[in-house]
C-alpha cells in the first residue's frame, strides 16, 4: 500500500498548496508510529516535485501515482509507482521510479552493483539494481502479474546529477526493469515515460494493482519447490517427521473442508523447526499450492493458503 495515492494533476495541486509533503508525513506517522527522518522529508519535498513536473511536461497528468509504495509482505518502499495504460497494448502498465538527489556517485572498486557518493557516508546498492529488484519482487508477489514482468518498467532518476558526475554508473547494463536517467537525460526520461504510459486515466490500473491478491507467482513457487526438494540435508528424523505428517494432514483436511487450521510446533534451538517448515514449503509448492514462509529473528513459521 502507498502512503499517498493521487493522480499527477491532483499531486500537482497539493504541491502548489504546499500540503503534499505534510500529507506524506501524516500518513507515515499514522502507519509507522514514528516520524520520518528530516532527510526523507526533504527528499519527498524536492524529488516528488521534480517528477510531477516531468510527468506534466510529458502530458501524463491523468497517470496515477502511488507515493512510497510498500512492497507486498516487505518493509521496503518504492519511492513512486506510476500506474496507467500502455500506449501500444492498451493493458495496465506500471513504472517503478526511484528518485535520488545525489550530485555525484562512483562505483566501488571490485564490485558491479555497489556505489559510493559524498551524499552518503556508506556504500549503497546501485540504483538501477535497486529498482530492477523492486520490479522483479512486485512481479513475483502480486497475483495479477504472476511473475510476468512485461507490464512493469523501472527507472532510477538522479534528477540533480549530470552524466559526467555519475559516468561510472552507466556501466551497469540497462534493462526494461532498470534504466538510469539524470538531469542531462531529462528528455530521454520523458520519452521513456511516454513509451510506457498513455495519457488516459490510470485509476483503474492502480485499483487492479492495489486490490490484487498477494501471493508468490507460479514460477517462484516452482523454483522454491525445486530448490527445497533437492536438498538432501532436509532429512526429517523421528518427531520431525511426525510433525511434518501432522501438518500435512491438517492442510489436506482444511483444504477439503474449506476451513483454516493452525498447527504450532514447539522445540528448542536446533530441534529442527526450520527444517520442518522448509520441507513443508517445498512439498506444498510442488503440489501447486500457494505457500509462503515468514521468518523472525529466532524462528521460522509457515503460512499456507
Language model segments and positions:
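Glycine- and acidic
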Residues: 113-122, 225-233, 261-266
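Charged, amphipathic alpha-helical linker segments immediately N-terminal to NTP-binding catalytic cores
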Residues: 205-241
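Conserved RecA-like ASCE P-loop NTPase motor core of nucleic-acid helicases/translocases
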Residues: 261-301
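P-loop NTPase switch/communication element
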Residues: 303-305
Amino acid at each position: 500500500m502507498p502512503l499517498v495515492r493521487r493522480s499527477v494533476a491532483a499531486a500537482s495541486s497539493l504541491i502548489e498548496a504546499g500540503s503534499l509533503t505534510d500529507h506524506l508525513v501524516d500518513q507515515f506517522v499514522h502507519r509507522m508510529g514514528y516520524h520520518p527522518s528530516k532527510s526523507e522529508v526533504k527528499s519527498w519535498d524536492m524529488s516528488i516535485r521534480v517528477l510531477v513536473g516531468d510527468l506534466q511536461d510529458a502530458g501524463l497528468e491523468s497517470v496515477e501515482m502511488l507515493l512510497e509504495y510498500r512492497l507486498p509482505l516487505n518493509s521496503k518502499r518504492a519511492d513512486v509507482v506510476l500506474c496507467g495504460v500502455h500506449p501500444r497494448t492498451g493493458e495496465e502498465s506500471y513504472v517503478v521510479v526511484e528518485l535520488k538527489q545525489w550530485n555525484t556517485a562512483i562505483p566501488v572498486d571490485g564490485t558491479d552493483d555497489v556505489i559510493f557518493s559524498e551524499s552518503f557516508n556508506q556504500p549503497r546498492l546501485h540504483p538501477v539494481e535497486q529498482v530492477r529488484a523492486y520490479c522483479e519482487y512486485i512481479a513475483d508477489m502480486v497475483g495479477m502479474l504472476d511473475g510476468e514482468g512485461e507490464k512493469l518498467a523501472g527507472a532510477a532518476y538522479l534528477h540533480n546529477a549530470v552524466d559526467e558526475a555519475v559516468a561510472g554508473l552507466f556501466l551497469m547494463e540497462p534493462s526494461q526493469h532498470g534504466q538510469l536517467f539524470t538531469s542531462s537525460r531529462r528528455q530521454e526520461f520523458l520519452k521513456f515515460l511516454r513509451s510506457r504510459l498513455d495519457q488516459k486515466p490510470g485509476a483503474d490500473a492502480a485499483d487492479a494493482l492495489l486490490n490484487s491478491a498477494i501471493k508468490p507467482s507460479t514460477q517462484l513457487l516452482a523454483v522454491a519447490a525445486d530448490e527445497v526438494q533437492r536438498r538432501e540435508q532436509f532429512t526429517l528424523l523421528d518427531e520431525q517427521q511426525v510433525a511434518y505428517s501432522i501438518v500435512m494432514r491438517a492442510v489436506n483436511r482444511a483444504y477439503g473442508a474449506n476451513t483454516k487450521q493452525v498447527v504450532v510446533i514447539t522445540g528448542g534451538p536446533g530441534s529442527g523447526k526450520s527444517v520442518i517448515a522448509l520441507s513443508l514449503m517445498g512439498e506444498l509448492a510442488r503440489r501447486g499450492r500457494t505457500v509462503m514462509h515468514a521468518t523472525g529473528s529466532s524462528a521460522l513459521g509457515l503460512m499456507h493458503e
